[in-house]
């Protein structure tokens, strides 16, 4: 039996493996992928507000999304420390944060256990965002069961072709 196992192992090691035609200099250009999530439109029976990148920068010098959304109707925020940085809480139409569905490019940011979003873990988020849609009240069904009170749908900016920087000195 040992001889048979030894012979089988020897045959397995000695069989040459072929890796197909690999050309390390060949570069393939792939099609771009667009990640999108559904948003409320004109004919959707949901009250919503859209904010683009310029509007976020205008109302939000500290790069806190909670602080920027506090200027929208039916939104009440509490910010610890008063600077806009750190732990923040938000209610929309009196509904607490655990019933607000928050997505970034269609990916849910709500905590799996408490359904809250810990905004302190994602600082300077508004500098990465291209647009935000705040749906007040019952959201679209594709936003999931967390959209009972409201939905915040964010999409990030696309990759630019030239380098740039942004400085805000207040």
Predicted regions located by residue number:
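Extracytoplasmic beta-strand/coil segments of soluble accessory domains associated
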Residues: 66, 70-108, 130
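N-terminal periplasmic "start-of-domain" segments of outer-membrane beta-barrel proteins
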Residues: 29-62, 89, 132
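Extracytoplasmic
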Residues: 30-32, 43-48, 72, 87, ...
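Cleavable N-terminal targeting peptides that direct proteins into the secretory/outer-membrane pathway or into
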Residues: 1-23
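Flexible glycine-/small-residue-rich
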Residues: 37-39, 92-96, 104-106, 136, ...
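A beta-strand signature from Gram-negative outer-membrane beta-barrel systems
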Residues: 123-168
């Amino acid at each position: 039996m040992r001889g048979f196992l030894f012979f089988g192992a020897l045959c397995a090691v000695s069989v040459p493996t072929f890796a197909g035609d690999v050309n390390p200099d060949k570069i393939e250009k792939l099609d771009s992928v667009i990640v999108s999530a559904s948003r409320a439109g004109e004919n959707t029976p949901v009250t919503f507000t859209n904010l683009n990148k310029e509007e976020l920068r205008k109302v939000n010098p500290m790069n806190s999304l909670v602080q920027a959304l506090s200027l929208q109707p039916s939104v009440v925020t509490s910010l610890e420390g008063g600077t806009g940085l750190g732990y923040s809480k938000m209610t929309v139409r009196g509904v607490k944060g655990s019933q607000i569905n928050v997505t970034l490019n269609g990916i849910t940011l709500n905590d799996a256990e408490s359904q809250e979003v810990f905004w302190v873990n994602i600082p300077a988020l508004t500098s990465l965002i291209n647009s935000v849609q705040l749906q007040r009240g019952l959201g679209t069904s594709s936003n999931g069961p967390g959209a009972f009170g409201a939905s915040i749908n964010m999409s990030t900016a696309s990759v630019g072709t030239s380098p740039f920087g942004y400085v805000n000195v207040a």
